[in-house]
Amino acid sequence: MRFVVALTGASGQILGIRLIEKLTELGAEVYAVASRAAKITLKAETDYDEGYVREIATKYYDEDEIAAPFASGSFRHDGMAVVPCSIKTASSIAYGIADNLIARAADVTLKEKRRLVLAIREAPLHSGHLKTLARLAEMGAVIFPPVLSFYTRPKSVDDLIEHTVSRIAEQLGVEVDYRRWG
């Protein structure tokens, strides 16, 4: 298994961190990329920094490293997740503005008909946001707002994070054991 995980500047950095951890724990290669804004938000929201992302990923890239292998369709991977995904990044992907590695890799993922999961972290959404997300869904992306699942009777924020990350991994095609409805 080989995945690309991108972190953008939206709130919810811990979801991206935990997804990288989970995928690597399950034996996957994880190629991580973080935007400049993600690095700022990561420090604001967590005790982690860019160095930790470099440590847990198989390979790490900055958003301006456009020559990264996954910027090309010839690089085979099993899917890409943008977690968290800002509206700015979603808009760039939706309209083909591949001006950084994250948008380029997502564009390539879509054109190669691979799984692209976007964990949109914005609320409320105006009609322009919704049209952009609908466009992405029509292009084949999975729009995955990290909505909290209370049917699991979480005892902590970590329980909520774990459940959400497990569901994102599942959208990438990874078999994950987690508590489901019913």
Curated annotation (Swiss-Prot):
The keyword Heme does not apply. It catalyses: dimethylallyl phosphate + FMNH2 = prenylated FMNH2 + phosphate. PANTHER family: FLAVIN PRENYLTRANSFERASE, FLAVIN PRENYLTRANSFERASE PAD1, MITOCHONDRIAL. Its EC number is 2.5.1.129. Belongs to the UbiX/PAD1 family. It comes from Archaeoglobus fulgidus (strain ATCC 49558 / DSM 4304 / JCM 9628 / NBRC 100126 / VC-16). Dimethylallyl phosphate binds at Y151, R167. It holds the Pfam family Flavoprotein. The keyword Secreted does not apply. Keywords: Flavoprotein, FMN, Prenyltransferase, Transferase. Flavin prenyltransferase that catalyzes the synthesis of the prenylated FMN cofactor (prenyl-FMN) for 4-hydroxy-3-polyprenylbenzoic acid decarboxylase UbiD. The prenyltransferase is metal-independent and links a dimethylallyl moiety from dimethylallyl monophosphate (DMAP) to the flavin N5 and C6 atoms of FMN. FMN binds at G9, A10, S11, S35, S86, I87, K88, T89, R121. One of its GO terms (molecular function) is flavin prenyltransferase activity. This is Flavin prenyltransferase UbiX. SUPFAM superfamilies: Homo-oligomeric flavin-containing Cys decarboxylases, HFCD (SSF52507). The gene is ubiX.
